[in-house]
């Protein structure tokens, strides 16, 4: 536990007193996710799912964030981050926290989740629990379904240690005896192909109708000797290596897509950053593996169970162990008219996903693709998937002769391969595909449809805080604005011109856009609140984003706090600001909401002396969003929509006392609890009730 931080003046706070380390802050978010696995607010199978989400999150954390810090350390970089820590110090703190977290993860799995699943007749059987009939079935399954695709690799001078794929399941086997060539083989490695299911369900006739499962790792472990005829397997131990998965791409290449394809293949074999082994792995074995992967014991993680929990997934048909089903509602405005275009002409339309349906966005594109009066469709795509309905509708529009322009961000992390496929699908259909601006990721969420009406060209625009991904729109909270506002439409048109053509920075009327005007305008908005507070007027700032790391904005918020501005921050993940510090940030409160849906909306609120400014945006308050990406930040001007966002999207979350976590000045997070007599308030449940 960190000690309390205090000073009599702002200047007395050192750097490490003013800021929280970014890497440690994101690790804290993953810990908040892990805590959902023991939260009785969630049904049992959803708690298990949070356990798996934690595994996936931690995998990416090591692949990207830890790998980056390790590179800095390897290069001898001793420069300190804003919080005052060197790369070496950061790695030490990550290791301490991650080891404790992973131990807790497996303790939750073994002591809470699995026993409770067993009470529901969902069992993950260990080898010693199988009946003779079940053992016979498993042996046959191994012989027919598993062994034919396994490739055991002996380790000797003729067979050096193999290159193993990032995050793949592997076994190291200790052997006695000689092989067919008379060689004395002591060790072998058996990689488990990703094509094999990690969980195998036993037939109902062998389980009395109960759901009994066996791990692939247990099946291989039990029958690994069959892979080495005439030899004896004296030990078999799971292990998994996590590698650096960040892409080092020279963006000055002539063909970005081609260069990306080459980098994607190398991602599978990047530098090792973590080794996971089972708890019973002998010291001489894991030391051998550490040497092969050039890792130290600080990077070794011993686990009490499968080394790849992220793939511990099975389709359990137990509705009572899941969340109640939720069907997103379609706003009434769309039910009163046959055409999306007619609805948008009447008013600005705000969509709040996943409580409201994503279908109107797809319907806008579908109508545009088939309407003979539509001339052009332009859209940005960051994450969508080649088989998504949106991509298929855009391809249909191109085939129907519409001028379709897609700005596809090929460098969206872990979606690069999918986005290359999206580009190919659209190009083959006849769409114009561009990859944005070299050096800047295109992260803005924009659609523009151009339609001929009464001999004039009319534009219809959708702006969003989240990706054009129908599946994510069912589990991520996001806002989308559908509008025909002429100024907003003209601004979107100009940003598309920036992305597809050449020329100077576009001068926009209403939109704020990164990397040009957004950061400076945010500073101006905060300065206005500071001036209002100093003049004795009401001053308040509410920001809801995924992350806050940008130092200038943090310092400006500190300045606002010292001036008396009330600052409320709803930060899902990373927050480098320290709230509640005397004479620095005592007027700043920070909370994080972790629940059924992943909080993804970006909303900025400035009270503006009673004439509130509310913006929705694709941008978090991070350096990369504000300076290295193309982002769109759009104002909400309709009074009814402003009221909706303020009440449902901000105040509702500030009142949450069930899913909220509160950041302390020492960098720790504590669970919000209702005060004595205070009514329980769950923000996401309130919205589910509101939009029934």
From Swiss-Prot:
What Pfam families does this protein's entry cite?
Answer: PP_kinase, PP_kinase_C, PP_kinase_C_1, PP_kinase_N
Query: What are the annotated GO cellular component locations?
Result: polyphosphate kinase complex
Q: Which residues bind Mg(2+)?
A: 383, 413
So where does ATP get bound? 57, 476, 572, 600
Which reaction(s) does its UniProt entry say it catalyses? Answer: [phosphate](n) + ATP = [phosphate](n+1) + ADP
Name the keywords, alphabetized. Answer: ATP-binding, Kinase, Magnesium, Metal-binding, Nucleotide-binding, Phosphoprotein, Transferase
**Obligatory cofactor(s):** Mg(2+)
Q: What is its EC number?
A: 2.7.4.1
Q: What class of enzyme is it?
A: transferase
Quote one Gene Ontology molecular function term.
Answer: ATP binding
Q: In which domain of life is the source organism classified?
A: Bacteria
PANTHER family linked to this entry: POLYPHOSPHATE KINASE (PTHR30218:SF0)
Q: Report the function annotation for this chain.
A: Catalyzes the reversible transfer of the terminal phosphate of ATP to form a long-chain polyphosphate (polyP).
What's the protein here called?
A: Polyphosphate kinase
Q: Which organism is it from?
A: Acinetobacter baumannii (strain AYE)
């Amino acid at each position: 536990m960190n000690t309390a931080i205090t000073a009599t003046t702002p200047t007395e706070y050192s750097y490490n007193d003013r800021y929280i380390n970014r890497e440690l802050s994101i690790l804290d978010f993953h810990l908040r996710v892990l805590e959902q696995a023991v939260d009785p607010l969630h049904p049992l199978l959803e708690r298990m799912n949070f356990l798996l989400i934690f595994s996936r999150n931690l995998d990416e954390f090591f692949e990207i964030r830890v790998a980056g810090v390790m590179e800095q350390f390897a290069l001898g970089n001793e420069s300190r981050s804003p919080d005052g820590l060197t790369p070496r110090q950061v790695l030490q703190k990550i290791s301490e926290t991650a080891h404790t977290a992973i131990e807790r993860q497996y303790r939750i799995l073994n002591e809470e989740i699995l026993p409770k699943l067993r009470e529901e007749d969902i069992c993950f059987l260990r080898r010693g629990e199988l009946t003779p009939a079940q053992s016979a079935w498993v042996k046959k399954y191994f012989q027919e379904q598993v062994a034919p695709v396994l490739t055991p690799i002996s380790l000797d001078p003729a067979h050096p240690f193999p290159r193993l794929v990032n995050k793949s399941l592997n076994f190291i086997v200790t052997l006695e005896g000689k092989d067919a060539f008379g060689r004395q083989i002591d060790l072998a490695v058996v990689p488990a192909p990703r094509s094999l299911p990690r969980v195998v369900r036993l037939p109902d006739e062998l389980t009395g109708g109960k759901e009994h499962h066996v791990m692939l790792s247990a099946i291989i472990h039990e029958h690994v000797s069959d892979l080495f005829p005439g030899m004896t397997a004296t030990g078999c131990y799971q292990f998994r290596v996590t590698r650096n998965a960040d892409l080092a791409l020279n963006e000055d290449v002539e063909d970005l897509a081609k260069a990306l394809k080459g980098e994607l293949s190398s991602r599978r074999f990047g530098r090792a950053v973590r080794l996971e082994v089972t708890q019973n792995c002998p010291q001489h074995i894991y030391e051998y593996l550490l040497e092969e992967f050039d890792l130290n014991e600080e990077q070794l993680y011993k686990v009490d169970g499968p080394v790849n929990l992220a793939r511990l997934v099975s389709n359990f048909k137990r509705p009572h162990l899941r969340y109640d089903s939720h069907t997103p509602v379609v706003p009434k405005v769309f039910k009163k008219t046959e055409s999306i275009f007619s609805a948008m002409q009447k008013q600005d339309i705000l969509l709040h996903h996943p409580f409201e349906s994503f279908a109107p966005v797809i319907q806008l594109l579908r109508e545009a693709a088939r309407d003979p009066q539509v001339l052009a469709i332009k859209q940005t795509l960051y994450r969508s998937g080649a088989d998504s309905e949106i991509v298929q509708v855009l391809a249909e529009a191109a085939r129907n002769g519409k001028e379709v322009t897609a700005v596809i961000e090929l460098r969206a992390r872990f979606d690069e391969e999918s986005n290359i496929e999206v580009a190919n699908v659209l190009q083959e259909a006849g769409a114009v595909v561009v990859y944005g601006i070299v050096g800047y990721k295109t992260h803005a969420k924009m659609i523009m449809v151009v339609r001929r009406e009464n001999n004039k060209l009319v534009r219809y625009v959708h702006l969003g805080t989240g990706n054009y991904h129908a599946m994510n729109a069912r589990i991520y909270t996001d806002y989308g604005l559908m509008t025909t506002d002429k100024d907003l439409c003209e601004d979107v048109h100009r940003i598309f011109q920036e992305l597809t053509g050449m020329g100077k920075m576009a001068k926009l009327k209403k939109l704020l856009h990164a990397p040009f005007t957004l950061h400076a305008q945010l500073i101006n908005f905060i300065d206005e609140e500071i001036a209002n507070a100093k003049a004795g007027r009401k001053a308040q700032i509410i920001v809801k984003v995924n992350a806050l790391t940008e130092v200038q904005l943090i310092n400006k918020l500190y300045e606002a706090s010292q001036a008396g501005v009330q600052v409320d921050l709803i930060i899902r993940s990373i927050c480098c600001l320290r709230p509640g510090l005397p004479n620095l940030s005592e007027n700043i409160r920070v909370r994080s909401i972790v629940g059924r849906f992943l909080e993804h909306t970006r909303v900025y609120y400035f009270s503006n002396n009673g004439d509130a400014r509310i913006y929705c945006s694709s941008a978090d308050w991070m350096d990369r969003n504000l300076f290295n990406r193309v982002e769109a930040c759009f104002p909400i001007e309709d009074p009814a929509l402003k009221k909706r966002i303020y009440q449902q999207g901000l105040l509702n979350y500030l009142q949450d006392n069930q899913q909220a976590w509160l950041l302390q000045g020492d960098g720790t997070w504590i669970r919000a609890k209702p005060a004595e007599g205070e009514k329980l308030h769950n923000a996401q449940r309130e919205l589910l009730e509101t939009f029934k």
